[in-house]
From Swiss-Prot:
It holds the Pfam family Hexapep. Gene3D superfamilies: Hexapeptide repeat proteins (2.160.10.10). The gene is cat. It is an enzyme of class 2 (transferase). PANTHER family: ACETYLTRANSFERASE, CHLORAMPHENICOL ACETYLTRANSFERASE. PROSITE patterns: HEXAPEP_TRANSFERASES (PS00101). GO terms for biological process: response to antibiotic. InterPro entries: Hexapep, Hexapep_transf_CS, Trans_hexapeptide_repeat, Trimer_LpxA-like_sf. It comes from Agrobacterium fabrum (strain C58 / ATCC 33970) (Agrobacterium tumefaciens (strain C58)). This is Chloramphenicol acetyltransferase. Its EC number is 2.3.1.28.
Length: 209
């Protein structure tokens, strides 16, 4: 298997890797896959190529750790309320399975917000929405939607804490800095690399007038 990464400290932005029409990515988001030696598309498990199929949508400025997995294709034909969870329908070449019903159910798009950090070998289940600014801990199993700026971890993943207080989170969601033009982002970089949300908000307000 080809290793797409020359160093564990250097990720490759997703826009230089992604080819699937059902994998949508924003700007600057990267996958740091050195230790698993595969492309990001290998992280999107069972991603169907069909038009109208569930999509994996990833925002801008996301950091995705090596070996993270996004489980796609809904229930993949497994119905736990049926007598058997086996997907007979998808083996039409077997004569005994000829009259099997199609158990596939879509889960809807999996949506990862902007500025999300996903730890190594975390697993995101189908149809999940991860809010802007969230952090997913290493090897977390995410089975429910994650609120913006929440830090979650564990199996199943639970909220550990919020990155900021509610007022600061509201300001960040109002500013949506990930959509700023390059000139504004450059001017704000000293504040972006600090924890002073109020100062960043003042900068944004003055720059927007």
């Amino acid at each position: 298997m080809e290793n797409y990464f020359e160093s564990p400290f250097r990720g490759i932005t997703l826009d230089k890797q992604v080819k699937s029409p059902n994998l949508v990515v924003g700007k600057y988001s990267y996958y740091s896959g050195y230790y698993h030696g595969h492309s990001f598309e290998d992280c999107a498990r069972y991603l169907l190529p069909d038009e109208g199929a569930d999509r994996l949508v990833i925002g801008s400025f996301c950091s995705i750790g090596s070996g993270a997995a996004f489980i796609m294709a809904g229930n993949q034909g497994h119905r736990n309320e049926w007598i058997s969870t086996f997907p007979f329908f998808f083996m039409p070449e077997v004569p005994e399975f000829e009259n099997a019903a199609n158990g596939y159910l879509p889960a809807g798009d999996t949506v990862i917000g902007n500025d999300v950090w996903i730890g190594s070998e975390a697993i995101i289940m189908p149809g999940i929405t991860v809010g802007d600014g969230a952090v997913i801990g290493t090897r977390a199993l995410v089975t429910k939607d994650v609120e913006p700026y929440a830090i979650v971890g564990g199996n199943p993943a639970k909220t550990i804490r919020k990155r900021f207080d509610d007022d600061s989170i509201a300001l960040l969601l109002e500013m949506k800095w990930w959509g700023w033009p390059a000139e504004r982002l450059k001017a704000a970089m000293p504040l972006m690399t600090s924890g002073n949300v109020a100062a960043l908000y003042r900068f944004w307000r003055s720059d927007s007038l």
